[in-house]
Amino acid sequence: MAAKDVKFGNDARVKMLRGVNVLADAVKVTLGPKGRNVVLDKSFGAPVITKDGVSVAREIELEDKFENMGAQMVKEVASKANDAAGDGTTTATVLAQSIVNEGLKAVAAGMNPMDLKRGIDKAVIAAVEELKKLSVPCSDSKAIAQVGTISANADETVGTLIAEAMAKVGKEGVITVEEGSGLQDELDVVEGMQFDRGYLSPYFVNKPETGAVELESPFILLADKKISNIREMLPVLEAVAKAGKPLLIIAEDVEGEALATLVVNTMRGIVKIAAVKAPGFGDRRKAMLQDIAILTAGTVISEEIGLELEKATLEDMGQAKRVVITKDTTTIIDGEGDKALIDSRVTQINQQRDEATSDYDREKLQERVAKLAGGVAVIKVGAATEVEMKEKKARVEDALHATRAAVEEGVVAGGGVALIRVANRIAELRGDNEDQNVGIKVARRAMEAPLRQIVANAGEEPSVIANKVKAGEGNTGYNAATEEYGNMIDMGILDPTKVTRSALQYAASIAGLMITTECMVTDLPKEDKPDLGGAGGMGGMGGMGGMM
């Protein structure tokens, strides 16, 4: 086991504080509408330019191991805020830096660190309650667009795109961000249910110009089995032919003579048919077939529940207004399913999602909800260069997380104003002793830090503007983009309550641990042993050959 280097008391805290400040100073320059960029060198490829706090934090490793421990703890604040709300990483870092700096000053002045921490925790619990009272619901498209714009560093096109996507696929819908191919941002929306399975035979194609199969008002046969024998399908085919409608077959597989017969029937124009494999595998396939059945008001023909294909009737078929099948995807548009049944299925899947333990399962369940509840939107980010594309994509993803958080818990006034109002509201809060009161003051002072940093990044004097904002009422604050005072909510400067709350809670949690640190332990640096470079000189002995 390697020897350890141990530091105690003030020596340890000074080193740790230096690490905290290096990381926080690098991150906080990105805060606010006039935040600056940070350039990150990569070991391969072009440098990355970013205004995303957590991306900057993740890059920082310090040479001094004690300082690095401080930096890594603040990095944890940014990561936790990012995981919880997807945004607010820079705010969380600024809050943590302020609490640690003020807290360690109090410790150096002889305060009890444990009481300080208790005071900070008390203040944060009270502040979170006040934040919830200030919060207003975020439901209309305009507010959603404003939240997206603020989070994407005042990029209005991004905010509008996200609001448009949410309007089209609903709050439960899946919105993904991809790299586009042009210079403009684009929004693609797939309405209805789409899954990644294409037609089983190109002979089903009836729109050669697009290479797709389009079926208008088809019957949909759902079978949880392989179909290889045409005999068991004949009753269904005859009934469908009589009804004069097309038929879509979704089964585990359709092969052999069954597939050949379906192709022949289609080519002769006897009945319009298309067959696709059911999406997913194993239990997930069964669940997705059931989803499609509920969406189209059909029944899954499964031998597990005693239903046989030969005895299937038109009553068991699902129906939809339109189905489009390409070689890779199938889209069912406007299923005939009962709205109440679809809603109860969505509730059931949401319940499973909340209980799921793995991220993969959660993601798949969320996709199923989206497919049932509204659809899937893809935002394609456009940019002129690779570097700009990466930077913009990260911003759009942040903005998307922020708007989701806003829809979930509502919004408060942005620009650091909500925290200042909250700090004023808890001015009368008292702890059990004087040291706890100092802890409460430390937390209240920290709540001003985000506004001060936004103002500093805009090139103004933080104290002057902070005092003016403190003297104001309600949502009155300072708009750093236009350099004027006004109602933040009317100006469209909003922060999701969840983002502000998470930033404050995680910052206080980790800063509290740092204030109560009394000892730090790390490995001693290994001494480099001198290499045996001198031994190479022995090669000269080759000259002895001349002595022979």
UniProtKB/Swiss-Prot annotation:
This protein's UniProt keywords: ATP-binding, Chaperone, Cytoplasm, Isomerase, Nucleotide-binding
Superkingdom, natural source: Bacteria
InterPro entries (UniProt xref): Chaperonin_Cpn60_CS, Cpn60/GroEL, Cpn60/GroEL/TCP-1, GroEL-like_apical_dom_sf, GROEL-like_equatorial_sf, TCP-1-like_intermed_sf
Location of this chain's protein in the cell: Cytoplasm
Recorded catalytic activity of this chain's protein: ATP + H2O + a folded polypeptide = ADP + phosphate + an unfolded polypeptide
Record keyword ATP-binding present: yes
Molecular function terms from GO: ATP binding; ATP-dependent protein folding chaperone; isomerase activity; unfolded protein binding
GO biological process entries: protein refolding
SUPFAM superfamilies hit by this protein: GroEL apical domain-like, GroEL equatorial domain-like, GroEL-intermediate domain like
Protein residues bound to ATP: 30-33, 51, 87-91, 415, 479-481, 495
EC code(s) of this entry: 5.6.1.7
GO CC term (a single one): cytoplasm
CDD domains recorded: GroEL
Keyword Metal-binding: no
Primary location recorded for the protein, binned into one broad class: cytoplasm
Function: Together with its co-chaperonin GroES, plays an essential role in assisting protein folding. The GroEL-GroES system forms a nano-cage that allows encapsulation of the non-native substrate proteins and provides a physical environment optimized to promote and accelerate protein folding.
HAMAP family xrefs: CH60
Assembly with partners or alone: Forms a cylinder of 14 subunits composed of two heptameric rings stacked back-to-back. Interacts with the co-chaperonin GroES.
Family per record: Belongs to the chaperonin (HSP60) family.
Protein name, as recorded: Chaperonin GroEL
Source organism of the structure: Sodalis glossinidius (strain morsitans)
Gene: groEL
